From Swiss-Prot:
UniProt similarity note: Belongs to the RRM U1 A/B'' family.
Protein name: U1 small nuclear ribonucleoprotein A
Lineage: Eukaryota, Metazoa, Chordata, Craniata, Vertebrata
InterPro entries reported for this sequence: Nucleotide-bd_a/b_plait_sf, RBD_domain_sf, RRM_dom, U1A_RRM1, U1A_RRM2
Xref: SUPFAM superfamilies: RNA-binding domain, RBD (SSF54928)
Gene3D superfamilies xref list: 3.30.70.330
Major location (coarse): nucleus
Superkingdom per UniProt: Eukaryota
A Gene Ontology term for the protein's cellular component: spliceosomal complex
Gene name linked to the record: SNRPA
Role this protein plays: Component of the spliceosomal U1 snRNP, which is essential for recognition of the pre-mRNA 5' splice-site and the subsequent assembly of the spliceosome. U1 snRNP is the first snRNP to interact with pre-mRNA. This interaction is required for the subsequent binding of U2 snRNP and the U4/U6/U5 tri-snRNP. SNRPA binds stem loop II of U1 snRNA. In a snRNP-free form (SF-A) may be involved in coupled pre-mRNA splicing and polyadenylation process. May bind preferentially to the 5'-UGCAC-3' motif on RNAs.
Organism: Sus scrofa
Every RRM domain range: 10-89, 208-282
Positions of modified residues (Omega-N-methylarginine): R152
RNA-binding in keyword set: yes
Length: 282
């Protein structure tokens, strides 16, 4: 049975999520599987009884939300198929970008008797384009950038260039593969007589098994599988008992493993952990 869709929106609403998954882990896993569709501004998850098993993912572009909805509809996520549709109203962060945001005093509205509510106030609360999602909670997540109400690029640290998806990943809407987004650092230009930066030492020969290092403590098998199963030939992820920082990923052949390695090299699962990928020793 198809999930009914409302009009396209920057925000997608996801339900039928596994309620046993911790909030922090759920946010990181959602980011891992949806970041391939475009820039994510925020992910809203609440553990309240009313909002369990639900989440909202806010994209900068509507086209990103559309691609995510169509591609991930029914995707088995923690053993349950996701049900996805567009959110009915704009989130606050999108309303601010559009210039339609209206600040609301929720406490005052809550205290005001119904008899004193004017038609205009009812319309602002019920139909305002900037109405937030009821029950949505925004809070810092260990290992992820703080979720703010102002649009910004994920993983942007002071003194560093904005985060860019790794080569081979789907580029942000409106940009061709390899094109530099506005504000990103261009490739380094060498001056006459200047030596290029030292290249890393040669690594192990090609192998159909990849060796992953510098993984954060909260990394799990499902999270890595969602990152690598978008590449042809993916077979499985193997974690090492007693070691959270390393893992192995197996592909059908060396060429497919190399393509995944090149695409996800340096991918930041968390703000401070850029994944390092090499061919496993034979």
């Amino acid at each position: 049975m198809a999930v009914p869709e409302t009009r396209p929106n920057h925000t997608i609403y996801i339900n039928n999520l596994n309620e046993k998954i911790k909030k922090d882990e759920l946010k990181k896993s959602l980011y891992a599987i949806f970041s391939q569709f475009g820039q994510i501004l925020d992910i809203l998850v609440s553990r309240s009884l009313k909002m369990r098993g639900q989440a909202f993912v806010i994209f900068k572009e509507v086209s990103s939300a559309t691609n995510a909805l169509r591609s991930m509809q029914g995707f088995p996520f923690y053993d349950k198929p996701m049900r996805i549709q567009y959110a009915k109203t704009d989130s606050d962060i999108i309303a601010k970008m559009k210039g339609t945001f209206v600040e609301r005093d929720r406490k005052r509205e809550k205290r005001k008797p119904k008899s004193q509510e004017t038609p205009a106030s009812k319309k602002a609360v019920q139909g305002g384009a900037a109405a937030p999602v009821v029950g949505a909670v925004q809070g810092p997540v260990p290992g992820m950038p703080p979720m703010t109400q102002t649009p910004r690029i994920m993983h942007h640290m002071p003194g560093q260039p904005p985060y860019m998806p790794p080569p081979g990943m789907i580029p942000p809407p409106g940009l061709a593969p390899g094109q530099i987004p506005p504000g990103a650092m261009p490739p380094q230009q060498l001056m006459p007589g200047q030596m290029p930066p030292a290249q890393p030492l040669s690594e192990n020969p090609p192998n159909h098994i990849l060796f992953l290092t510098n993984l954060p403590e909260e990394t799990n098998e499902l999270m890595l599988s969602m990152l690598f199963n978008q590449f042809p030939g993916f077979k499985e992820v193997r974690l090492v008992p007693g070691r959270h920082d390393i893992a192995f990923v197996e592909f059908d052949n060396e060429v497919q493993a190399g393509a995944a390695r090149d695409a996800l090299q340096g991918f930041k699962i968390t703000q401070n952990n850029a994944m390092k990928i090499s061919f496993a020793k034979k």
